[in-house]
Every structure is written in C-alpha cells, then in structure tokens.
C-alpha cells in the first residue's frame, strides 16, 4: 500500500506518497526534501518528529520510550506509514528539551 505523508516543516508543509515498506525519511529525501537526521538507525533523536494524524510503524527504532511514542513522537528514519499521516518535523528540541 502507498500512503500520503504530509510533513509540517519550519519551511512549510510538504506532501508526497510513501509506500508502507519505505522509511518516511528515505522517501522524503527521494522526493527532494531535506530533513534532519544523524544515525539513520533509530538510535538517536536527530530525526524526531511528532505524528499529529495517522499512524506509523517504528518498531525498528529503539531510542524512544513508550511514553514518548504515546505522546506522538516518531523517528522518521525508522518509521513506515500505516495510514495517511501528518508529521511535524524538527522536534528534537521538544523531545529532549
């Protein structure tokens, strides 16, 4: 399946289609959008965003705890879309602050 991903970035929103077996960060880059990242392995908070609508599968990540995920935080480098999804990007400071 392919879902619509909307990223709300500091430069404004961007939308693109993302297959459910491609990480959102990878697909965003494929579409020409630059997002923050560091490890690309779900082990840090550089790429953190916040899901405001829809659902993702980020079971490949290990940095976020259950409370953070319940609050909507997502690591875009290990997140697969599970529905049409809206994510606010550049949330590392909010997460770690």
Swiss-Prot record:
Highest taxon of source: Eukaryota
Keyword set, alphabetical order: 2Fe-2S, Chloroplast, Electron transport, Iron, Iron-sulfur, Metal-binding, Plastid, Transport
Cofactor: [2Fe-2S] cluster
UniProt xrefs under CDD domains: fer2
Cellular compartment(s): Plastid, Chloroplast
Residues the entry annotates as binding [2Fe-2S] cluster: 39, 44, 47, 77
Every 2Fe-2S ferredoxin-type domain range: 3-93
NCBIfam families, A to Z: fdx_plant
Family: Belongs to the 2Fe2S plant-type ferredoxin family.
Function: Ferredoxins are iron-sulfur proteins that transfer electrons in a wide variety of metabolic reactions.
Protein name from the UniProt record: Ferredoxin
Native organism: Brugmansia arborea (Angel's trumpet tree)
